[in-house]
Design a protein with these regions (language model features):
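Positively charged n-region of N-terminal signal peptides that target proteins for export
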Residues: 1-4, 8
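C-terminal motif of bacterial Sec signal peptides marking the signal peptidase cleavage site
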Residues: 12-15
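N-terminal helix-cap/turn-to-beta initiation motif at the start of protein domains
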Residues: 18-32
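A glycine-biased structural micro-motif
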Residues: 26-29, 46, 52-56
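Contiguous, well-ordered beta-strand patches that form the walls/edges
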Residues: 36-42, 59-113
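Short, surface-exposed coil-to-beta transition loops
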Residues: 50-53, 102-107, 127-133
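Short, solvent-exposed coil/turn segments at beta-strand boundaries
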Residues: 55-64, 110-119, 137-141
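Edge beta-strand at a domain terminus
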Residues: 71-86, 118-142
Length: 142
């Protein structure tokens, strides 16, 4: 009975507190890599868990929002056209953003569908995209 009362009070307090939108940083650990949709290096295809955890962002048809989790402080993004080659390699791609910190390009974000998180990384030597990965939200099963 005591546990039920505590649970009810907790639920009432949660309902009364103002709801703030949850940022992607708040849910940073709630996503796992579901599928690599493009990779130009064989080792990334083999390593299903290989990605740059510092570049995690959520994109939709109107904007690109992202959290840098301390490593990068001032990330800007620029919407760019998909090349013919990119459209062939990633046919699901609808919109592409280049991500920058100052003059340095960090990576790309590609919009493939609504409310899905994607990550990508650039090769530091030749500047080409290494992979684009689809992320899946982890849901807790009770």
């Amino acid at each position: 009975m005591k546990k039920v009362l505590i649970l009810l009070v907790t639920m009432m307090l949660c309902a009364c507190s103002p709801a703030e939108p949850m940022s992607l940083k708040d849910s940073y650990g709630q996503y796992k890599q579901e599928k690599i949709v493009y990779a130009n290096k064989k080792d990334y295809i083999k390593k299903k868990d290989a990605y740059n955890a510092y570049l995690v962002y959520e994109i939709n048809k109107d904007a690109c929002t992202f959290e840098s989790d301390l490593k990068y402080q001032n990330i800007q993004y620029k919407k760019v056209e998909l090349s013919k080659d990119e459209k062939e390699k990633v046919p699901e791609a609808l919109i592409k953003y280049n991500l920058y910190e100052g003059e340095k390009q960090l990576g790309i974000a590609v919009y493939l569908g609504e409310e899905t998180v994607y990550i990508s990384s650039y090769d530091q030597y030749d500047g080409s995209p290494v992979y684009i990965a689809r992320m899946k939200k982890i849901t807790k099963k009770s």
